[in-house]
Every structure is written in C-alpha cells, then in structure tokens.
Amino acid sequence: MAVAAALLRRRALYSALASPSWLHDTSSCYICSISGTHSLVNHPNLRLQRGYHNSGKFDLTDLTHPHIWYPNAREKKRNVFLHVGPTNSGKTHNALKRLEASSSGVYCGPLRLLAREVAQRLNKANVPCNLITGQEREEIEGAKHSSVTVEMADMTTEYQCAVIDEIQMVGCRSRGFSFTRALLGLCSDELHVCGDPAVVPLIQRILEPTGDVVTVQYYERLSPLVPLKTTLGSFSNIKAGDCVVTFSRRSIYMLKRRIEMGGKHLCSVVYGSLPPETRTKQATMFNDQDSNLNVLVASDAIGMGLNLNISRIIFSTLEKFDGICNRELTVAEIKQIAGRAGRYGSKFPVGEVTCLNSDHLPLLHSALKSPSPIIERAGLFPTFDVLSLYSRLHGTDFFQPILERFLDKAKLSPDYFIADCEDMLKVAAIVDELPLGLYDKYLFCLSPVDIRDDISTKGLIQFAENYAKKGIVRLKEIFTPGTLQVPKSHNQLKELESIHKVLELYVWLSFRLEDSYPDRELAASQKSICSMLIEEYLERSGWQQNGRKDFLQKPKRLHQEYDASQLRKYFQEIDVRSK
C-alpha cells in the first residue's frame, strides 16, 4: 500500500485551487490491493481502460480512449453546441448570453485577457463571477460562475452551462491538450464551444463515443472585410485606425519609429512579450478617440484577446519565425489576423486588409478566399498520476527519462497527437539535477517559464534550487525591490520584460506551493511596477517632441491610471533608494 499512501498524501497536500485541476484528473481514484511487484490503481478511468484489453494488467501508455478519463462527464448526456464562424461573427457573444442566463457556469478561454474580460462582463450584468487564472485569483462571495484560463478548468464541479472559446486550439502543438481535456471533461448540462469551422469534423468524431448530443450552428461575419487590390505604397498613406502587422520586436519598433517620423501619427504597440496589463493599456489608448495614438503596430498577438477598433490591417510581411525557421503564415493565421479589421457597431464597421509588399498580395487574397485547412487531430498529455505510476513501475524519480520513455511508448488513436514536450524536457533536465520529488519536478516543468529567455530560465533555476535546499523561497533572496527603472534602450526594455516574466513565475508558483513561496503580494506589486515602467518607456520612445508635448498635457495621467496603493509602494521604494 506504499504507492496508495503516497498518492493519497500528495493529493491531500494540494487542493484543487492550488494547482491546475488537470494535474489530478484521476483524483477520484480508489486504491486497490497490490499484488506482486506492480502497483495497480482501481480508478474508474483505468477500470474502463482495462475493459478494452484482455490482458490482466493495465497499459498506462494506452491513450487511445481519452473520453473514459472523465467519468463525471460521461455520467451526463451533455448537449454540446458548436458555434463556428469567422472573426467578428458574434459566435462567442451568443454563447456568453447563454452563460449569463444559466444558474451556474464556467467560461474557459485561451488567454488571461479574455478570462478577465468575461469575468468583468458577467459581474457587470449582476452575475457574480470568479476569475481564476494561473497568476490570478479574484473570488466573489456566493459566485456560481467562474471565468478561467482553460488550463485551470475544474473537471469535478457540475455546471449548468460551460463555454470553451477558440476551440480550434485543440490542434495547437503545445496547448492543445488543455482544450481537449476541457472538451471531453467538463461536467456540464450544456457545453457551448466556439471557434473556427475547420475544427467541426474533428470535434464530431471526438465526441461520438461520449453519447453527447452535438448541434452545429454556423455564423457569418457581421461586417464586411475587403481585401484591397493595391498595397499601402508610401508610409505617408498611413491613416488613423490602421494596424501594421509584423512579427518581431525589432521590426515593431522600427515601424513605429518610421511612422512617427512622418509627424502625422503616434503609435501604440502590442506584442506577445509585453505584460498583459501593458497590452491592454496600449489597446485602450489606441481605441480612445481622444488619444493621439491613432495607429497600432502589432504582432499576431492581436489575433485574439483584445477588442480593437481597426479600420485596416496592413501586413508588413507574410512570413514569421516560428522558433525553428522562417515560414509563410498559414491560411488560418492570415484569416485570424486580417479578420480583426472592421468591427460590428464600431467606428470602423467595414474592414480593409492589404500588404506593404506587392509580391504578397496574391497570397493574401488567396488565403482570404480559402477555407481554413481542416484540423485533423487534437492534443493529449498524460496526467501526473499516470506518470507517477509509470515512474514507480520503472523504479526512478528522474522525470526526463520517464517522460521520454512514456512519449516513445504512448499509443494514440488517429484523432490525437501527444503535445510538444520539447520545452518541458529541457526544464526536466534542469530539475532532475535537484533533490526534488516527482510531483515538484512535474510542477516546475508545467510552470510558465520562457526557456528561450535567459533571465526567465535563470529565475526558474534559482526558484527551484532554493526550494530544494530550504523548502521556502523569499523573493528578496533573488530579486531586490526598488531597483527597477524606466528603460533607456531596447535592450533594457527587453530585460525589464524578462524580469516581469520571472515575477509572474513566482506568483504562479505561489498559488501552487503557497507556504514555500510566501511573497506573492510583493511579487505582484513589483510586477505592476514593471508594467508601469514599460509603459513609461513606450510613451517616451520614438515620439516627435511636439506630438509628445501635445499628448501629455496632463502630467499626472500615469499616476491616475494605476492603483494608488501600488503607486505608494513604488514611490516609497524610490525614496528609500535615493537615500
């Protein structure tokens, strides 16, 4: 019974809110007697899985029937409604109206920005709604609704209504498994699933063995999207409401400077490594008709999660570096970005789209006329309990070799693929050097570390090392509050963005190992200061003197836009530093 006791102790130690619930989708398991040298778990999922085999032992690497992993959902005959259509078609709006009208429910989105937006919408409609993301918890007394990032969705709570947004992300190599888990596992009478029509055949196949009733509702775009026959031409043709899209930090700031040098426009910027709060603030200033920031320069981060009043999308290029090589944008990527132009009920109801380079126009026009390629497979990833049992069967707590072996042996149906674990394996190699248990290693491997960012990676290593040595990690041992300053160059800006990632990592860990990472409030306040300083840099960088002077008529604007308590902390630290 040693395995049983260990699993139960671990499970008691970590509550549902302390970690993403999908870590323990097998948390309802009952431990049975153990015979011989192998430990068998009499979990409903594994019990059902055994029914698919005639052998006398379980095959933990058999992932061919993932719908049986969620017995609570299988006890229901769910009514599943697929709301599918292009950007700006109203598909998500209709699903959210049903969520508002339900007695209990959950919204599962791909981004914190979307989760926060939905929580605010429901609370404004007098429907108390919690916000739960990897880095945030805002719980409302008496709330029966929650808005969560998809990884945080709870498979054990029963809801009247659940909504999954951007379901086409089941095909994402890195995060698709979280959407698959929500699709198969949410225990809800009604499940409303929103996304691209390209995912419909796959969803229908996946849900067929569940017994759920599936209804598909197709939507058309509410406002026209017009692909232009000519390129932008000169940058002097930039006009208010334009969004120039490019795919690297360097080119974003280069284009921003070039546009502002014309003396007619000031630019907001949005890209992935900006803090979410900064992205929201930049989008708000772009949307504000009283602001002089009437042009947006952005990456594909605008594809989802931000409400933007864009009149025209201008692609500076139709190629991007995907972490491995430069490649052409896919049809789905082009349509997702282009679709942000024009917004029903906004100042720009008709959207336009063009390019800087005339050689790119044929690809742009072809992509907009084409249906998105059908999504063939959905992502899967084993839960911690499965990997824990697998490691015990092989007599090792080294996570990297266990994960590699499991992935090599995993058996899948044609509708699924195993999630891309390249980054996870790199983190596993780091934490395997430390005296940590398997669960802790697994947790660090799931953490939001940017393994391609040196500062972010060093932060993870220090957090893990201090945790392994002392069991408690004080933020001040790694990071000195009061040392942050407004960046003076792009390199310093990038460094500040990386520091923000490290602080976010600390907050993430503090929600899962609360006693060991006790400085959540300090990390959160420093995170807010990072965002403030980045925004101050964006206000200073590249603006023409007259335009900047014109815009900053209210010198206290920055002060007014931040929570007063955060500002007090910030300026107290500045005072201490000056002494």
From Swiss-Prot:
Cofactor section: Mg(2+); Mn(2+)
Source domain of life: Eukaryota
EC identifiers of the protein: 3.6.4.13
One Gene Ontology molecular-function label: ATP binding
Amino acids binding ATP: G85, P86, T87, N88, S89, G90, K91, T92
Keywords in alphabetical order: ATP-binding, Auxin signaling pathway, Cytokinin signaling pathway, Gibberellin signaling pathway, Glycoprotein, Helicase, Hydrolase, Mitochondrion, Mitochondrion nucleoid, Nucleotide-binding, Nucleus, Stress response, Transit peptide
Compartments, as annotated in UniProt: Nucleus; Mitochondrion matrix; Mitochondrion matrix, Mitochondrion nucleoid
Domain Helicase ATP-binding stretches: 72-213
Annotated protein name in UniProt: ATP-dependent RNA helicase SUV3, mitochondrial
Lineage: Eukaryota, Viridiplantae, Streptophyta, Embryophyta, Tracheophyta
